[in-house]
């Protein structure tokens, strides 16, 4: 059987593709609008469709992962991503592109959240935030690659090439996972006596919602999605329209966002020891807040680039803290709890995208960024005050 470290590297490859798929349209919205004779706000539906499907499907992947094994679900979700990415590359109209992007989101939903839940099963709480930070490195690299390549392809190769490349990445990841994780997947298939029906799962989910800690984590995750991740989808368009970057240039600048998060993932242990979870949440919210306000009102390209870097650093200080809280809010139903966390996060993001798309077409994106920045400053303080830095007594990996 492969070690958990080896398995983590392999699922990191699938997670890379998942985040690349999520962010690949950010830098091509203007190009899509031109090709399909739509506004940039209308073209942003290719992002919101992915996000909505991604969030809703968590309600299925949670119980599915608990029933047949998280790694098995990750493998088949990755195969499905390869198929739907190929279909997306052939979409002839904006409406069909939106539908195929929704299918991509529905498939990709089975990768990262279940990977987080798998880490929660395998890694003791004391090492969990550091381990999640390493998984974060794979997702951030995927996000960076997706945002850059989406803009580059739209400008130089044609946007369809971007989805062909994604299909190839997902296929390779699925084949490698299928070949190397057979033993782990078999080991995680629960006995028939332990399986629960879907109605029982949904009853259990409602029971989770009765827990104050679960409700708090889900509330702040929805706010994070609406205030932070929704704004992230429109930063490349802001860079093009207000700072004079080309689509590929905007994608390249967005690499700095991922680089900021990647820096955090590499030094997470030291920062956690220095600031604690409360300090990380407070500083992260403040950093992202300041960067959004700068992107809203600054005019110098170098300030935009610096803001992207520090926004990435700040967001993942806050988000990694919330991820860790999600793995611990209901340890007895961790797979379902973490996918519920992801569902609410992306539902919040989809709501934020709808508001920001309308503000973009009305020319008021700067005001929306400023309001979101203020909200993130408040959110970081709220999380800092209420986060639970628990140290469980004898929590062991779940075999």
What are the residue ranges of the model-derived segments?
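Conserved MFS/SLC helix-loop-helix module at the cytosolic interface between two early adjacent transmembrane helices
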Residues: 56-95
